[in-house]
C-alpha cells in the first residue's frame, strides 16, 4: 500500500505559512510538492504488497525491478504478471463541531511485467541472465475530503475565507492578483470604502453566522516503466540494474463555499471559490543493486537509486461565483481567472537500501528492508530566475530532513498455499513543528496481509493493505482560525495473476 498524500499533515501546515503569499502571486511550488513527488511506496505485485514491500533481499518478483534490480537476477524461469487493484479511501473530518465523511473508490493497475530468463546450465560462474520490462505503481494521490461547519455569529472567534482576500488587499494594495483579489472584487464580494480607504466584506461586517463547506478532490499517481537487466553468478551473487521512466499525474480540485443559511447577513447570500491544479510530468532514473547468499539460509541485499529528474508542467486557475439576496439564487457573478501554464524541473533525493532475508527451506521466509533518503536534497529549477524557486530550495533545506523507512514481511508455505503478512514504517520527511501546541510528525504505518496459490505454470496472489492517518487541516489563515481534524482510512485490495514459461 502506498499512502495517499502522506505528507498532508505537513503540507497543510505549509499552507498556513505560505498562504499570506498565496494571494500575492500565482501558485508557487513548495516543499509539499517536493515531498509528494519524491516519496515511493512500491505498489507492485500482490505478493510484495502482502509482505510489506520487503523484497530488497528476496527477488524473484517483478516489484524488485523498482526496489532492488538484483532481484530480477534471482529468476530461474520466465513469467508474466498482471496486478489490478481496488483503492478504497475514506475520510472523516471534524470542523467547527461537525463531523463529515467522504470517500473514493477506484481501480488502478499496480503492476504489469514480463521477465525473460536465460539459464546457462552452469552451477559455477555465470549461471543465468534475465531481462525484465514492465510497469510498477509507486505512489497514488487519490483522495476526497469534505469539511462542513457553521461560524457562530457574534462569538468573537468566527471568520470567513473572504477575510483572507480583504486583509491581503488592504495590506498589499500594490499587489493585485488576477487569481484571487481581482475575482473577489469583480464578484462584488470585496467592495471598497473610499472614505475609510479600505476594502471590506459583508460577512465580517454582519458578525458572521454563515455556513462553510470545503471539498478537496485529489487524483493521480506516479508509475514507473522499468527496463531491468539481472545476472546470476554461481547462484550466490546476483546483480541488477534498472532504467526507469516515471510518469507523474496529480490533480487537485478544491471548492470552498459559504452560505448565509440563516438569512442574518444583509445583502449577501453565498459565494464559491474554486482552485484547479493539474500537473503532469516525466522523469528518468537509474537504479543498481546486489544480492548475496553467503549460505542457503541467508540473503543480503543492497541497492542505490539515483535521483529522479522530472520535467513537470502545471496548469493552475481559479474562479469565483456569488449570489445575493436580490436574485433567484443563480450566480449573479461568475469570474474566471486566466490559466497559468508553468514548467519546471525537479530533482528528487537519492535512495540507499539495505536488506536481509532468512529462508527456512521451503517452509517460510522472513525479510526486512531499511531505506534511507534525505529530502533536503530535493531541488527545483525553472531554468529561469524570476519564479522564486531559489527561495523554495532554501525552504526545502530548512523545513525537510532525512528519513528512514523500514519494511518487514513474512511468508509461510502450506502445501499449494502461501500465507503472508507485513508491515512498513515510513519516517516523516519534515522537521518537528508545532500544531495546536503539540509536536507533529508525518510518518506512516501500513499493515498488510495476503495469500497465494502456486503451481508449476500458474500462480494467483491476493493482498490487503490498510493505512490509518490523522492530521490537521487549516482552511485558511489566520493561524488562530479553527482547523479541521482529519482521519483517513486507506485500503487497497490487489490480485496478481501470473504465468510461468
Question: What does each of the following model-derived ranges do?
Answer:
Residues 1-32, 497, 501:
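Bacterial Sec-dependent N-terminal signal peptides
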